[in-house]
């Protein structure tokens, strides 16, 4: 896809990831300014905040299909077996680890997270505690010492038997958590995932396992840490010969009843007010996804920086995986891991 943008051979209408705007069109050269077709594409159905997130180089280069964020999901059946309610706070979660180990066994954990999940939860924790965004104006807002605090928090979850080690997850032999037998049978009783992922994880559970939406924790600090992001966008190629027709198609899919019914919530809870109303009026929303999405968007204070998801950081050979795996294996202490993380992030931001 990146080659098609570079060579001008991309389709007229594109479904893109949000960070593609900054990756492929930081100067506005790849995507058409949708403000030019606002007489056809009804932009009033989208919040100013959401449109601003897609505005780069003073051009509205895409329109958001949906917004998403991270939240906890729990296997209530396993918590019931442990004699516990599902966690409403960080304190509840920390207390659950030893209870799971004592009452259910060493293989049971209240929560399971891979390296990228851990990075996001660490950022939630730090933003809650320190009250500032992770990155702002293309600059990392946290010192190595503050990040070390966040890494120690992640280590404390392992130490308290709240989450399994990376080695344990690797030994499970599953390519992803939803395909892990320990998630399927309830031995891993929680995940920290995008609100739109509910169906995938619920569908993977064995029969009889009850899956519920959790809460955003408010006892990590005085601020509401965490972030929402545009989960997916529609964009028009800059070199299109048919901008009006492209705008009409996007408006049909996002704002008009017939098109909205086709899309439903397959790509998340609609960011368009008109689209959301159509889905609500026609019972087209997955109830758990809708519940999770409303909780996330009501809680978070911060926007995700688009470079947070840069390949050099989030891919399995990237900085996040190196840092979190190294910390879990004991290859790095928190100070070393913080230095590596800062260096890797600043390298991406400075490109």
Q: Which stretches of residues belong to each language-model region?
A:
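Hinge/lid segment of periplasmic solute-binding proteins
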Residues: 17-70, 146, 212-215, 288, ...
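Extracytoplasmic "Venus flytrap"/periplasmic binding protein-like
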Residues: 1-46, 77-88, 181-190, 204, ...
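A local structural motif
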Residues: 9, 83-85, 137, 158-173, ...
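Glycine-centered hinge/linker elements that transmit conformational signals in sensory
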Residues: 97-98, 139-171
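C-terminal capping/gating helix-and-loop segments adjacent to ligand/active sites or protein-protein/ligand interfaces
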Residues: 228, 290-349
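Short helix-initiation/N-cap motifs at beta->coil->alpha
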Residues: 18-19, 90-94, 167-184
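Mature extracytoplasmic/periplasmic domains
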Residues: 30-33, 196-199, 216, 232-314, ...
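A structural signal for short loop-to-beta-strand junctions that line the ligand-binding cleft
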Residues: 3-4, 11-12, 41-78, 109-110, ...
